[in-house]
Every structure is written in C-alpha cells, then in structure tokens.
UniProtKB/Swiss-Prot annotation:
PANTHER family on file: FORMATE DEHYDROGENASE 1 (PTHR42938:SF9)
Family: Belongs to the D-isomer specific 2-hydroxyacid dehydrogenase family. PdxB subfamily.
Primary enzyme class: oxidoreductase
Organism this protein belongs to: Pseudomonas fluorescens (strain ATCC BAA-477 / NRRL B-23932 / Pf-5)
An example molecular function term from Gene Ontology annotations: protein dimerization activity
Keyword set, alphabetical order: Cytoplasm, NAD, Oxidoreductase, Pyridoxine biosynthesis
GO cellular component assignments: cytosol
Record pathway: Cofactor biosynthesis; pyridoxine 5'-phosphate biosynthesis; pyridoxine 5'-phosphate from D-erythrose 4-phosphate: step 2/5
InterPro entries according to UniProt: D-isomer_2_OHA_DH_cat_dom, D-isomer_DH_CS, D-isomer_DH_NAD-bd, Erythronate-4-P_DHase, Erythronate-4-P_DHase_dimer, NAD(P)-bd_dom_sf, PdxB_dimer_sf
Name of the molecule in the record: Erythronate-4-phosphate dehydrogenase
GO BP terms: 'de novo' pyridoxal 5'-phosphate biosynthetic process; pyridoxine biosynthetic process
Residues noted as binding NAD(+) in the record, renumbered to the chain: D146, T174, D231, G256
Amino acid sequence: MLIVADENIPLIEEFFAGFGEIRRFPGRAIDRATVEQADVLLVRSVTQVDRQLLEGSPVRFVGTCTIGTDHLDLEHFQQAGITWSSAPGCNARGVVDYVLGSLLTLAEIEGVDLAQRCYGVVGAGEVGGRLIEVLRGLGWNVLVCDPQRQAAEGGDYVSLEQLLERCDVISLHTPLTKSGQDSTWHLLDRQRLNRLRHGTWLINAARGPVVDNRALAEVLRQREDLQAVLDVWEEEPTVDASLADLCVLATPHIAGYSLDGKQRGTAQIYQAYCRFLGQAEQVSLSALLPAPWVPQVSLNANADPAWALAMICRAVYDPRRDDADFRRSLSDDVAQQRSAFDGLRKHYPERREIDGLEVRIQGESAALSRIVRALGAREA
C-alpha cells in the first residue's frame, strides 16, 4: 500500500503509518509521476486532483484536509470509482478566530464600538454558520446571505444586494463555484464593490476569486472610506503587492491555520479512510494535541466587556503578526514572492483556538459570562 501525501499535512505518520508506505511531496509538486503507483492520495487545496492527474494510476481513495472541494474533480471520481473525503468544518473555528481578531484591529484603528455595527455574513456553511452563532451570541446585529440555504430551508435570509446596502461589515465565507445560478466567481465584482456602504469593512477569508481583485484595488484607491482584510488572493501564491498595500490586514491564506484545525483535518480523512476499509479507528486526535501555551485567562468581574472581549481573543490569536510577516515577504520578484507565500504557510507557528481556552471570572458578571459563552471558551 502506497500513500502519497502533501508534506504540509500534520500527523500523517501518526494516523496513516499503519496502512503502508508514506511518501511526502510539496503539494504544488504532486503530478502524474508522483501518483503513478499510489493507492491513496492525501492533499490540501493547493493540489488540483483531476482526470489528468489520476488517469492510469491505482489511486482509489483521495482525502483532502480542507473544507472546500473546488480543487477536486468529483465527476471524475464518480466515473472512476474513486472514494473521496474532505474535512468539513475542520478549520471553521480558526477562521472565526481570524475574523474576530480582524474586527478588533479595525475597531482600534477607527475607534468604533463593534456592538454598534451591522454584520453581513455571505455563506452560512460550516465557517459562516459558526461565525453567525458567535456574533449573534455577542448580541450583535447580523444579516445572512445564502441563496442555496434559503431555497432549501426558507428562514431569515437576505439577498446579497440587501446585505451590501444595509451592513457595515461584510465577511465572505462561500465556496468557490464557477457555474450555475449561484456561482461565486467574482461574486463581488466592480459593480457590487462600488455599491458598498460608506465606511464598509470587507473581509475575505473564503477563496480569492470570490472578489475581483483588480476591481477591488481600483475601488480601494478611489474610496478611502473602505477598509479591506484579505487572507486569500485571486492568483495565489502570486499576490498583487499593490493590493496588499491597500489592505488594513493582508495574510497568506492562513485564516484557518490553527494547530487544532490542521490536525483535525488529518483526523477526519483518517476516519473516512478507516470507514472506506471497514476497519476500526486505532488513533485518537485527543491523545496527540499538545497542551495550549495559554490555557487560562483571568478577569475581574468589573472588567469592561469590550476590553475583556479583546483580551480573550488576543490571548489566543492576533492577526497583526501574520500581517507583518506577510508584508515583509512581498517582493517584485514573482518567483521569490510565490516561494515566500508557500514558505509562510509551511512554517506557520503554532496557534490554538479560542474554544480551548478557559476563562476565570473573579466575581459575577452576566456580561462577561455572555461573552465567554458566545466565543465558545470555557468559564472556570
């Protein structure tokens, strides 16, 4: 049994060594020669897995340690009898932490009260749904656009046009689709970007091409009232440095890169592979996760709620460090810049999630307890 895996997938040996030989490669370097003898292929979003890659190979199981599947040719898998698995929700918490950290940074820059803003979440799947729960748990006003869920479930959804018209913050969490009525390719094009409310904050931690990057750069140059946070880029790992310069925060597709999320993704495809083989699971993620660097935060009950929110979130993650590292990596040399983009992701420092944090409140405070519950942390 030969298992070919992206070298950046964590815990591959711990989860898969019992099944056969493991060969690891850079994700962008996986090609036909790499998989010509492989039985199992384990990838991330940087590897396009399609007929051209797999035809003639013995691969019968493909696992991707990602939520999205736009890099997988699912039609070919069905035709070729290939079983596949993604890792739905594996990094949802990490992306939510990224968005919260971005909001705190924007609020400090502009001196605004986050509780007074209207939030628009586009896409209510694993990530968007988790973000909606947190924001509403904090008591904030949230509007949601998700045409597919609206058609299937009904409920309290708004159109994208209504959301753009009414919201001060737009956070994108859609998959990337290029066809059909609900295509998300350039969902925010020049026309829609020009319709953003005065002072809107735009956050894209979904897929780069969901926003027309060239149009966004032009609109940001024309409208100094707008603020943008980009974690994903239309041509990544190539990045338009001039667009990054226009963003308040710019990062190299690491919004969901928590240690918990990455290892959870590996665990999920391991579980799927065990089901494929009809075997019982022998390895548990809980036994492999290390203790967090900051296990607990203590607050007095008289702490200001807005300050407490920032303290809890930043005890776990602050995106400004990733922003600084990314900006230092930008270069006019395209090859150097592409290599640096992948290098930042490959050597990303350990980062944990808010729901692994314990918060001790000295005294009683309903407001602080509500914040802790909304964030998903544990109150001691």
